[in-house]
């Protein structure tokens, strides 16, 4: 397209400016409920069935984070090979989910977990291990007990 035609089109579309009529730009506000209704109607077309009794869903990502759904609504259409999981999702690090998630990990995740496990003890030891200098400073902060306070309180009571 040549530059002259493009300049004419741009001049026609100009919004605002001195002496020109302003063209209102339409703004479409989408709400979550509208999106949810569209999603539910699409799922209804796929003939999904509700799956009851699922307490939690964990989706493990490659970067070591887990998308965790607690008490989700799970719908499935086996003919369309489609699963829909709706509910409140939380992104958590895999280390936070560790004891209960081990049975759900695949071979890929187990190798990445081993690497994480090798790094984790080093980080914990580096951050939590008190240095000998720190121990001495903590002792200096606590004053030594010089008097017996029990005798003073007994004298005040009499």
From Swiss-Prot:
Cite the entry's keywords alphabetically.
Methylation, Phosphoprotein
Instruction: List the InterPro entries hit by this protein, alphabetically.
Output: BTF3, NAC_A/B_dom_sf, Nas_poly-pep-assoc_cplx_dom
Say yes or no: keyword Magnesium present. no
Positions with biased composition (Acidic residues) = 134-150
Q: Which CDD domains match?
A: NAC_BTF3
Give the sites modified to Phosphothreonine. 111
N6-methyllysine PTM sites in chain numbering: 5
Q: Does the keyword Cell cycle apply?
A: no
Q: Which residues form the NAC-A/B domain?
A: 33-98
Spell out the residue ranges making up region: Disordered: 122-158
- The family this protein is said to belong to: Belongs to the NAC-beta family.
**In its UniProt entry, what is this protein called?**
Transcription factor BTF3 homolog 4
Q: Which organism is it from?
A: Homo sapiens (Human)
């Amino acid at each position: 397209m040549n530059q002259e035609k493009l300049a004419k089109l741009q001049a026609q579309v100009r919004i605002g400016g001195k002496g020109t009529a302003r063209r209102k730009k339409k703004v479409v506000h989408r709400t979550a409920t509208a999106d949810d209704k569209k999603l539910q109607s699409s799922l209804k077309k796929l003939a999904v069935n509700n799956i009851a009794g699922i307490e939690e869903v964990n989706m493990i990502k490659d970067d070591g984070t887990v998308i965790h759904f607690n008490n989700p609504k799970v719908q499935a259409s086996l003919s369309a090979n489609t699963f829909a999981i709706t509910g409140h999702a939380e992104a958590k690090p895999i280390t936070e989910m560790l004891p209960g998630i081990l049975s759900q990990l695949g071979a890929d995740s187990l190798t990445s977990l081993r690497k994480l496990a090798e790094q984790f003890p080093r980080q914990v030891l580096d951050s939590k291990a008190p240095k000998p200098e720190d121990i001495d400073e903590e002792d200096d902060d606590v004053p030594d007990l010089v008097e017996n306070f029990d005798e003073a309180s007994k004298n005040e009571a009499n």
